[in-house]
Amino acid sequence: MLAATVPAAAQAPAAPPSPPPSSVPVPGDLELSKLVWSTLAAIDAANEAGNYSVLRDLASPQFQAMNDAAKLTQVFASLRASRLDLSNTLLLAPTFTATPRFVQPGILMLKGFFGLRPTPVAFELYYQWVMGRWKLAGVSITPASIASQEPALSQQPAAAPPRRRN
């Protein structure tokens, strides 16, 4: 399993989720999709160029403080080596596997996947509300198996065909 994850501080805490602070807007469906698309496009461009400075500059101040461009190069090395084309995620709407929620005041978690073939892309993204904008605060991207992303089919055996009477 390939993963790119940063930073631990942005991961979901053990405490139950808190409601969003009143000054933090709750994004609508289109805004949620745009956050995911823009993040994956930025990561794809960084992987192509081997330069993560723009991705870092687009992120939250806490993310920037914890990750310089060299560290991000290391963090995303396995994803880059997999040559997974994240630009294909721009062709589909993300499928959310969990309801987008606030895991800390001002920290929004989005979890889901893109049902691409042959390799779906799973994501877990964290955003922080900073100066009137959502900024990347944490990221995990993994290639996923198709079977793990599709709803389980019924395990009932097929009915035997009726017997013909002569």
Show the residue positions of the predicted features.
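Generic detector of short, well-ordered, non-transmembrane alpha-helical segments enriched
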Residues: 6-7, 51, 121
